[in-house]
């Protein structure tokens, strides 16, 4: 049980770190690209504002 709780806390910390890093380095979060060597991960957010 303690190991699961520790893993959950670690996952939350990693997610928060990624979000904060994206907020600091990007003007918006509609497109985020991470490149490592030959691997690229691209995340796109599509949304329509409500009228």
Swiss-Prot record:
Additional remarks: Probably inactive in strain K12 MG1655 due to a genetic locus rearrangement, the locus for its antisense antitoxin RNA is missing.
Keyword Cell inner membrane carried by entry: yes
Transmembrane segments: 5-25
Identification of the protein by name: Toxic protein HokD
Pfam families according to UniProt: HOK_GEF (PF01848)
Gene Ontology cellular-component annotations: membrane; plasma membrane
Family label: Belongs to the Hok/Gef family.
InterPro entries tied to this protein: Hok/gef_toxin (IPR000021), Hok/gef_toxin_CS (IPR018084)
Subcellular location: Cell inner membrane
UniProt membrane topology term: Single-pass membrane protein
PROSITE patterns named in the record: HOK_GEF
Function: Toxic component of a type I toxin-antitoxin (TA) system. When overexpressed kills cells within 2 minutes; causes collapse of the transmembrane potential and arrest of respiration.
Keywords, sorted A to Z: Cell inner membrane, Cell membrane, Membrane, Toxin-antitoxin system, Transmembrane, Transmembrane helix
Signal peptide (from-to): none
Biological source species: Escherichia coli (strain K12)
């Amino acid at each position: 049980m303690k190991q699961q709780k520790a893993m959950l806390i670690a996952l939350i910390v990693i997610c928060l770190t990624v979000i904060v890093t994206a907020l600091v380095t990007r003007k918006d979060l509609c497109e985020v690209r991470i490149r490592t060597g030959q691997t690229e991960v691209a995340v796109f957010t599509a949304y329509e504002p409500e009228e």
